[in-house]
Amino acid sequence: MVELEDLPSVGEKTAEKLRDAGFADMMRLATATPKELSVKAEIGEGVAEKVIEAARKSEKIDFETAYDVLERRRDVGHISVGSEGFNDLIGGGIETQSITEVFGEFGSGKSQISHELAVTVQLPPEKGGLDGECVFIDTENTFRPERIEQIANGFELDIDEVLQKIHVARAFNSSHQILMAEKINELIQQGNNIKLVIVDSLMAHFRAEYVGRESLAVRQQKLNQHLHALQQIANTYNVAVFITNQVQAKPDSFFGSPTKAIGGHVLGHASTYRIWLKKGLAGKRIARLVDSPHLPEGECVFKIKTEGIVD
């Protein structure tokens, strides 16, 4: 394994700065930008370029064949929920190395699915999990350990052990939210087997802090950087990223849905999978897959019960 000190232009002091800034992993270093590395590690941009170039050579980052991509995708894992219909809709569960977005009005089940995934990621692979831990970035004060207990009971898991493997960060503004996402690298490098990152909800702070058309460009730029950091974590560490999103009304809509997901094209392009949640009759929920690189559009019906998500 190549160590930081083995790279050209990296002495003990530079290596220490890189580790302190969360760049101890060679792939994390290879996928950074010179500006990002320069700012976070407090090194010159010229040095940053040389370090990144050396890291890319050590990781052999170059063109690869479609066959190589297929082989790499064999490492992709899936995190299931208690509804077989929902799992089938998204190809077996929430996918690692990807960002999955669910959006819908309040009470449509976004946070409920988030809580369930925080538990099921801890299941062994043969039961639909990844034997992993979860990071839960809570922006709206919706995380409830009591709900985790109910779902863990439904899966007959040890409640204390389940709670210990969920790392919760209460984000109070968009800058804090971005910082907590960046600190996930440190958690992983400390030996925590993080396999799922949940952001519930992604846009709440951005929506509240950047008001008016004149601030839209700044908001979208900041959001894009945040999503890029989340995707980098997903790719580097084979992690699933699950984000919930709000909707807004379309008053000029006479046909189709009267609501749409917020976040604009930046979020639309960043999300690998997009799932629209709707309320149905008799307490049912409807999940519709509206965007995927390889799965067809479709929908399923599920219910939310004390023990979690069920068909």
Curated annotation (Swiss-Prot):
InterPro entries in alphabetical order: AAA+_ATPase (IPR003593), DNA_recomb/repair_Rad51_C (IPR013632), DNA_recomb/repair_RadA (IPR011938), DNA_recomb/repair_RecA-like (IPR016467), DNA_repair_Rad51/TF_NusA_a-hlx (IPR010995), Hlx-hairpin-Hlx_DNA-bd_motif (IPR003583), P-loop_NTPase (IPR027417), RecA_ATP-bd (IPR020588)
PROSITE patterns associated with the record: RECA_2 (PS50162), RECA_3 (PS50163)
GO BP, one annotated term: DNA repair
TM helices/strands, residue ranges: none
MF terms (GO), sorted A to Z: ATP binding; ATP hydrolysis activity; ATP-dependent DNA damage sensor activity; damaged DNA binding
Keyword DNA damage: yes
SUPFAM superfamilies: P-loop containing nucleoside triphosphate hydrolases (SSF52540), Rad51 N-terminal domain-like (SSF47794)
Cited function: Involved in DNA repair and in homologous recombination. Binds and assemble on single-stranded DNA to form a nucleoprotein filament. Hydrolyzes ATP in a ssDNA-dependent manner and promotes DNA strand exchange between homologous DNA molecules.
Family of the protein in this entry: Belongs to the eukaryotic RecA-like protein family.
Protein name per its UniProtKB record: DNA repair and recombination protein RadA
Organism: Methanobrevibacter smithii (strain ATCC 35061 / DSM 861 / OCM 144 / PS)
